[in-house]
Amino acid sequence: MLSIAVTWLPDRKVCPWHSTCDYMEASRIVVASHMHAGDGNCHVNIPVNSNDAHMLEEAEETAARVMAECQEMGGEVSGEHGIGITKISFLGKSKMDALRAFKERVDPRDVMNPAKLVHRELPVRPFTFSFNRLINDIHASGLPDKEKLISLLSTVQVCTRCGKCKQVCSMCYPERSMQYHPRNKNMVLGMLLEAVYYSQVNKGAIDDNLLRWLRDLVEHCTACGRCLANCPVKIPSGEVALTLRSLLEHENAGGHPIKKRALEWLVHDVSSRVPKAAKMASLGQKVQNKLLGVVPSVWKKRMQSPIFAGSGPKMGYTNLYESLRLHRGSVFAPREVTPGMPCVLYFPGCGGSLFYDRIGLAAIMLLLHTGHAVAVPPRHLCCGYPLLAAGMDTEYEDNMAQNRQYLASMLRNLIKQGFDVRYLATACGSCRDSLARMKLNEQFPQLEQKDVSQIVLPLLQHEGMEAPVAPGTNVLYHAACHCEWAGVPTLKGQAQLTGALEQLCKVKVSTIPGCCGESGMGAVTSPTIYNLLRARKKERLAQAFEPQPQTGACYAGPILVGCPSCKIGIARCLIQLKEKHPVLHVLEWLANQVDGEDRRQRFRRRANETRGDVRIVQC
């Protein structure tokens, strides 16, 4: 009995001294002076752990003592953030009566903040939200999605509410009452996830209204990651949106059943079905443009979807695999292969191979021109980003595993052939984002992931090219949501690219900010959101096309883009503006400088004269 007591009692000590000291130190109330830089405002601030109910009560008592002391010394109640909760009980009767009279005069129906500032007693006790308490409660629960909920809450709880994300977020459009920047969404998300938790605990399922509101948050994000560069605490809001999308899909609340079924059908046989679907889309767009020509404009104006609201940009019918006959060989070299020849594994993706094969052709031609051998997957591979953006994480993981295995096999074969494979290159920001998740550099440490323009621009510095524009004019460049330059912060990537273009071609490259309004399939699946973004982009394009004050000349050059999806989006904007400007990917524009306007047909002819394991194409 004694031995049992000796082992049982120490484990049940009531309150060790060191634990008491730690708690007292952590819950000690500190009355701090909080000063605003610039305006001279200095006021009291009481830091509180919102998950400690006892500390909250002590803080309220302390605030009451401070307010009482201030009023005894002749101080007044001010309202920097409002007087409605903490300070209302200290507001004098005369001032409250004056406020009541003022509200009755300007707001007789009591619409704005009803019953605010006119009653000292609060109708309910205010609730202070606590991320930590909610995380602990969810962790102790048995909810199936608790890991996702905890991950989301842990990510957004460090938000400082500074609002620096507003400056770069495409979804911040105050003129149209669009305030979906991460600062606002982080605050709303915490409250919604708390409601999701209690809904699951009480009902066993998430309320449909909550799912609808969560979906609204997710739809208002392109997952570009620009906000991460501005965020002082580095909250990956793009990843938060993707995680939320996955959570919604698991609840069958993604909101786009047709899109989901189409992606499920495509992902079962990517190499065969996706090229066929791209051909159908190209052919369908041509037919639709003709049919819409006879539809009355009054009807088209009523349509929200850009598919039915007007003509759309044309897309290529012949894909890269057919243009270069990659079944004859998918490795190209500028000269006879020697051991250690630099080689680039080029991943064209859907945009550079199916919708616009000229982007893929330009990429291969430029890489060959700069002395690199180029390897292209002989069959179509999709990076899977549409699956990730749709919340289909299981299908995305399966597709990524297949791609990783296939690309790793290609890399091993290239190394056996004597190539020095230095880069995995793309010409699309979302492709590069998705490929980075494969982590091929863990198997091949020497492999760097870069944009094709990032590889070729430094090597073209000595070419002495001149841009085909009149002296003194600018080249307009649309900055894509996803950064075009790897290895640098998102906001600096565009400056790096435009700076390299200016240095190479001796022209001024002017950036037109703002989302193009396409965002992959976003323009079709969420037209109410992306129509607003497209309208803002059209305004900025129209301003760029205005006559110059000095010469009176209008801009007549191309619009450069760094993303295949943006090529579609900007072309759609120009169609609606009735402006005729070529929309060129940066690689297309560079290839024109290197080999002329007719370079596409000549390069295809030279390439198709070769076959074999390594096809020698001199550029």
Task: Describe each model-derived feature in a short phrase.
Residues 45, 53-57, 168-170, 177-180, ...:
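Extended hydrophobic-aromatic, low-complexity segments
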Residues 160, 164-194, 220-247, 434-437, ...:
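Iron-sulfur cluster-binding cysteine motifs and their immediate structural context
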